[in-house]
Curated annotation (Swiss-Prot):
GO terms for cellular component: cytosol. It comes from Streptomyces avermitilis (strain ATCC 31267 / DSM 46492 / JCM 5070 / NBRC 14893 / NCIMB 12804 / NRRL 8165 / MA-4680). The gene is nusB. Belongs to the NusB family. Involved in transcription antitermination. Required for transcription of ribosomal RNA (rRNA) genes. Binds specifically to the boxA antiterminator sequence of the ribosomal RNA (rrn) operons. InterPro entries: NusB-like_sf, NusB_fam, NusB_RsmB_TIM44. PANTHER family: ANTITERMINATION NUSB DOMAIN-CONTAINING PROTEIN, N UTILIZATION SUBSTANCE PROTEIN B-RELATED. This is Transcription antitermination protein NusB. The keyword Transcription regulation applies. It holds the Pfam family NusB. Transmembrane segments: none annotated.
Length: 144
């Protein structure tokens, strides 16, 4: 599963870059793919990375709405950019990628927070995604 871990990390980096630059994530994804084809130092972008980024792009408004609704005391704008994008990726994978077990989604998101964010971030990410996991059946019914 190391390949999936790497794919998630790269998807997070693409979301983060898009957020930081104020550019659509699909544009950033296309840039990454182009660079990986022209620069041998850049590893190729995996199918799973593409699936995560493209899936997120289709659900971005709903994902941001859910994060805003359940992140008690935080607005998206006030949230650290790293945490915001870990939560975006985790929310997409948790609610719309059925082949990934929920526990794996939460664990991977917490690991990203440990690697890229503050000491308080892993607990914040785990708490919010844990809440969405509890609500997953009703949230999915709303989507149908």
């Amino acid at each position: 599963m190391a390949a999936r871990n790497t794919a998630r990390k790269r998807a997070f980096q693409i979301l983060f870059e898009g957020d930081q630059r104020g550019v659509d994530v699909l544009t950033v994804l296309a840039d990454w793919i182009r660079h990986s084809r022209t620069d041998t130092r850049q590893p190729p972008v995996s199918e799973y990375t593409m699936q995560l980024v493209e899936g997120y792009a289709k659900k971005v408004n709903r994902i941001d709405e859910l994060i805003s609704q359940y992140a008690v005391g935080w607005t998206l704008d006030r949230m650290p950019v790293v945490d915001r994008n870990i939560l975006r990726l985790g929310t997409y994978e948790l609610l719309w990628v059925d082949e990934t077990p929920d526990a794996v989604v939460l664990d991977e998101a917490v690991q990203l927070a440990k690697e890229f964010s503050t000491d308080d971030s892993p607990a914040f990410v785990n708490g919010l995604l844990g809440r969405l996991k509890e609500l997953k059946p009703s949230l999915r019914r709303e989507e149908a």
